[in-house]
Amino acid sequence: MKNAIHPEYKEITATCSCGNIVTVGSTAGKNLTLDICGECHPFYTGTQRVVDTGGRIEKFKNRFGALGKK
């Protein structure tokens, strides 16, 4: 690596809205504020909701089901 051409690599803190604080490395040099992290994201916490599309599929079949029949 060449000397004096690379940005300075610093440790910064990333603070989530849930209160979780993570220390990460960055060349930006500013502390970050996150909206969501691994501690509060629904996918990682297991509180993910399943979207029910059954009603949409039935509505589609009712509207266009007769077109496929000969």
Curated annotation (Swiss-Prot):
Q: Which Pfam families match?
A: Ribosomal_L31
- Which SUPFAM superfamilies does the protein's record reference? L28p-like
- Glycoprotein among the record's keywords? no
What GO annotations for molecular function exist for this entry?
Answer: metal ion binding; rRNA binding; structural constituent of ribosome
Would you say which domain of life the source belongs to? Bacteria
Which cofactors does this gene product need?
Zn(2+)
Residues that bind Zn(2+): 16, 18, 37, 40
- Is the Zinc keyword given for this protein? yes
Q: Which UniProt keywords apply?
A: Metal-binding, Ribonucleoprotein, Ribosomal protein, RNA-binding, rRNA-binding, Zinc
The family database entries (PROSITE patterns) matched by this protein are listed as: RIBOSOMAL_L31
Where are the annotated coiled coils located?
none
**Cofactor stoichiometry and binding remark:** Binds 1 zinc ion per subunit.
Q: Which Gene Ontology terms describe the biological processes this protein takes part in?
A: translation
One annotated Gene Ontology cellular component of this protein: ribosome
The region annotated as signal peptide is none
Its subunit composition reads: Part of the 50S ribosomal subunit.
As for family, the record states:
Belongs to the bacterial ribosomal protein bL31 family. Type A subfamily.
Purpose: Binds the 23S rRNA.
**Per its record, how is this protein called by name?**
Large ribosomal subunit protein bL31
What species was this sequence derived from? Psychromonas ingrahamii (strain DSM 17664 / CCUG 51855 / 37)
Q: Mind giving the lineage of the organism this protein is from? A: Bacteria, Pseudomonadati, Pseudomonadota, Gammaproteobacteria, Alteromonadales
Q: What is the primary gene name for this protein?
A: rpmE
